[in-house]
C-alpha cells in the first residue's frame, strides 16, 4: 500500500445512517444522525446531554486548505499523511485541559477513532474569535501600510514585524456572510468591533449581552492555557482562532462551549522559541505551507488577491505540488502534535475501512 493510499482525502462518502445531506467543509465532514440513533447512543453511552439532543459524526480528512483552496501533490497524494490525526489529537488534548481547568466544555462527546468525533449539535456564535500575542501576518501587513486601528483597538506606532504585542489582543471577524447588521459589511471574514457585537448581539447568535464578556474570558483564558503549555516544550503561541457555540446539558440548561478545533497548526501560528530568540521565524503551523506556496508559484499575487479567486482555484486544481512539499508539512504536523500530547501518533493503514468497522461494530451506525 502506497503512502497516498493511507491519506483520507474523501470523507463525505461513508455509509453512515443519516436522513440529512452530509455537510462537507474544507477539511471535515459532518453526518447528522437520525433522531432514533441519537437517542439510542445517548442512552447506551451515557452522554451528559439531554435525551433528545441531536448528535453527529464528524470525520476529519487529511486534505490541506490554504488561500481558500484545496491542494494536492504528485503521485495521487490528495492530502497530508497524518494531518487529520494530528489535528484531532491536538484539539482533544486542549479541550480536555480546558475542561480539567474549569474553563468550559466542548462539543465532543466521544472519540471512536483518531479521525472521528461524536459531537453534540451546537448553535454557533457567528464570530471567528481571533486572539493575537504577536504582530505578524495580515495584521502586520495592514500596520506596515499605516493602519493603527484594528477591530476598534488603537495600536501604538513604532512596532516591528513579529514582535510581541504590549497586550493580548482580541480581533474578531464574522463567521460567514452576515447580512443586515449596521456597520458590518456583508462579506465573509470581515473584522468587527466589540461595539458591533454589543449593538447586535442577537445577530451574532449570543443569547445575552453578558455572554459577550464570557466569550472574551474563555478566549483569553484558553489562549493563556495553551500558551503556557507550549512554552514548556519550547514553542510560542503567536495567534489563533477559536469558535464558540451553545448547547444544552442533560438538565436542559444552555451553556457556552468551545467548538470546532483549538490550538492546532491549522487554526494557529506556532513558532519555535529558540529560533525566535535568534531572530528567526520557524513555523510549526500551516503558515509554513502558505509560505511554501507563495515561494513556489511565480505570481504570488494570485494567492493574495481576492479578486483573482478564479485564477487561484485553477492554479490549485491544475498544479500538483512536489510530494516533498506535503511530506514536509506532514512531518511538521506530526512532530508538533507528538510534542504537545507527549506520545507517538499511530497512523491508520486504511482509515476509511477502520472507521466503518468501528462505527458499525461499536455504534451500530452503518447501513
Curated annotation (Swiss-Prot):
The species this protein was found in: Psychromonas ingrahamii (strain DSM 17664 / CCUG 51855 / 37)
Keywords from the named record: ATP-binding, Ligase, Nucleotide-binding, Purine biosynthesis
GO CC terms: cytoplasm
Enzyme nomenclature, EC number: 6.3.2.6
Domain of life (superkingdom): Bacteria
Reactions that this protein is recorded to catalyse: 5-amino-1-(5-phospho-D-ribosyl)imidazole-4-carboxylate + L-aspartate + ATP = (2S)-2-[5-amino-1-(5-phospho-beta-D-ribosyl)imidazole-4-carboxamido]succinate + ADP + phosphate + 2 H(+)
GO molecular function, one term: phosphoribosylaminoimidazolesuccinocarboxamide synthase activity
Extent of the signal sequence: none
Claim: S-adenosyl-L-methionine is one of the keywords in the record: no
Pathway of action: Purine metabolism; IMP biosynthesis via de novo pathway; 5-amino-1-(5-phospho-D-ribosyl)imidazole-4-carboxamide from 5-amino-1-(5-phospho-D-ribosyl)imidazole-4-carboxylate: step 1/2
A GO biological process held by the record: 'de novo' IMP biosynthetic process
Pfam families (alphabetical): SAICAR_synt (PF01259)
Name of the protein this chain belongs to: Phosphoribosylaminoimidazole-succinocarboxamide synthase
The family this protein is said to belong to: Belongs to the SAICAR synthetase family.
Amino acid at each position: 500500500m502506497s503512502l497516498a493510499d493511507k491519506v483520507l482525502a474523501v470523507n463525505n462518502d461513508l455509509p453512515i445512517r443519516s436522513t440529512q445531506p452530509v455537510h462537507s467543509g474544507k477539511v471535515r465532514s459532518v453526518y447528522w444522525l437520525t433522531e432514533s440513533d441519537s437517542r439510542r447512543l445517548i442512552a447506551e453511552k451515557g452522554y451528559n446531554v439531554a435525551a433528545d439532543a441531536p448528535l453527529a459524526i464528524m470525520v476529519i480528512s487529511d486534505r490541506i486548505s490554504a488561500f481558500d483552496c484545496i491542494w494536492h501533490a504528485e503521485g495521487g497524494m490528495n492530502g497530508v499523511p497524518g494531518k487529520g490525526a494530528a489535528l484531532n489529537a491536538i484539539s482533544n488534548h486542549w479541550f480536555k485541559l480546558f475542561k480539567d481547568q474549569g474553563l468550559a466544555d466542548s462539543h465532543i462527546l466521544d472519540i471512536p477513532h483518531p479521525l472521528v468525533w461524536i459531537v453534540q449539535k451546537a448553535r454557533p456564535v457567528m464570530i471567528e474569535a481571533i486572539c493575537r500575542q504577536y504582530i505578524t501576518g495580515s495584521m502586520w501587513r495592514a500596520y506596515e501600510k499605516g493602519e493603527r486601528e484594528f477591530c476598534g483597538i488603537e495600536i501604538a506606532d513604532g512596532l516591528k514585524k513579529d514582535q510581541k504585542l504590549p497586550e493580548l489582543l482580541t480581533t474578531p471577524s464574522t463567521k460567514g456572510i452576515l447580512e443586515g447588521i449596521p456597520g458590518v459589511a456583508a462579506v465573509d471574514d470581515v473584522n468587527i468591533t466589540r461595539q458591533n457585537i454589543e449593538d447586535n448581539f442577537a445577530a451574532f447568535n449570543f443569547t445575552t449581552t453578558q455572554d459577550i464578556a464570557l466569550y472574551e474570558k474563555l478566549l483569553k483564558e484558553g489562549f493563556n492555557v495553551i500558551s503556557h503549555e507550549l512554552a514548556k516544550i519550547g514553542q510560542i503561541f503567536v495567534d489563533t482562532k477559536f469558535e464558540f457555540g451553545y448547547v444544552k446539558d442533560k438538565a436542559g440548561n444552555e451553556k457556552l462551549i468551545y467548538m470546532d478545533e483549538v490550538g492546532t497548526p491549522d487554526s494557529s501560528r506556532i513558532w519555535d522559541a529558540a529560533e525566535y530568540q535568534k531572530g528567526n521565524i520557524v513555523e510549526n503551523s500551516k503558515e509554513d505551507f502558505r509560505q511554501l506556496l507563495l515561494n513556489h508559484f511565480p505570481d504570488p499575487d494570485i494567492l493574495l488577491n481576492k479578486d483573482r479567486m478564479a485564477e487561484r482555484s485553477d492554479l490549485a486544481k491544475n498544479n500538483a505540488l512536489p510530494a516533498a512539499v506535503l511530506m514536509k508539512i506532514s512531518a511538521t504536523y506530526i512532530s508538533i502534535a507528538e510534542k504537545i500530547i507527549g506520545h507517538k501518533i499511530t497512523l491508520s493503514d486504511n482509515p476509511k475501512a477502520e472507521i466503518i468497522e468501528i462505527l458499525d461494530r461499536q455504534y451500530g451506525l452503518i447501513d
